[in-house]
Amino acid sequence: MSEVTSARRGRPRQTREQAEEVRARIVAATAAVFTRNGSRGLSVAQIIEQAGLARPTFYRYFGNAEEPLHVLLTRSNEGLVGGIRDALTGSDEPVQLGIRLIDAFVGWARGHGPMLRPLFAELHDPASPVSAYRERALEDIRTTVREKFVELGRPVPTPLDLDAALHLCEYVVYRLSAATAPGEEPDPDVLAPARLTMIRVLLTTLGTRADLEYALELPWIFPRE
């Protein structure tokens, strides 16, 4: 009697690339649902409907609806903090550093597209997970800015001055997002004066007399009128 070996039937084992693709699909669906409904309107049912996946598939990767949202918020923080860190390593000239920091902030916001609206709507809501991520990002940015001031041999800004500058940037970027239709780029006629407002405020809160004197020679910051 000959021995017969039968192959195991069933679905083939998922590759790492396939698993990452499904995970990314869930995270993208979470972003879409969050954009429409905010964190309070986030549910597994809506995420799997958006992703076109079965519920067991979702739970193979995430335990609840908040977990993929945390992935999104972590990426958002890394993008903002990393962008500002890169901006502050690109120059040793104080005024240019301030401008680069602002442009990093604006670039981060533009990269979020329509998701920026619910993100900003929940920044100051203690019940939202977005709020905790905001605090972490701000603390990382404070640390990065202080380290750059020390590296340049400049007096470290007071906590109030630094927070005033960062909160102003945050607010202006929010205003830009509120004035921009979902999925569209900010109107250049709105973006240019908003960027200029941030530059002027950073100069006066974090800069020195020498910085202001230098900036006064730049007519695009302070027109000669």
What does each model-found stretch correspond to?
Residues 71, 85-111, 165, 192-195:
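Hydrophobic alpha-helical connector segments
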Residues 109-128, 146, 174-181:
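Amphipathic alpha-helical segments used for helix-helix packing
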Residues 43, 117-120, 131, 185, ...:
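Short, hydrophobic secondary-structure boundary micro-motifs
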Residues 1-9, 107, 143-150, 175-225:
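C-terminal peripheral helix-coil segments that are non-catalytic and often amphipathic
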Residues 52-62:
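Short hydrophobic/aromatic patch on the recognition helix
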Residues 78-82, 108, 128-153, 159-175, ...:
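Amphipathic alpha-helical packing segments from all-alpha helical-bundle domains
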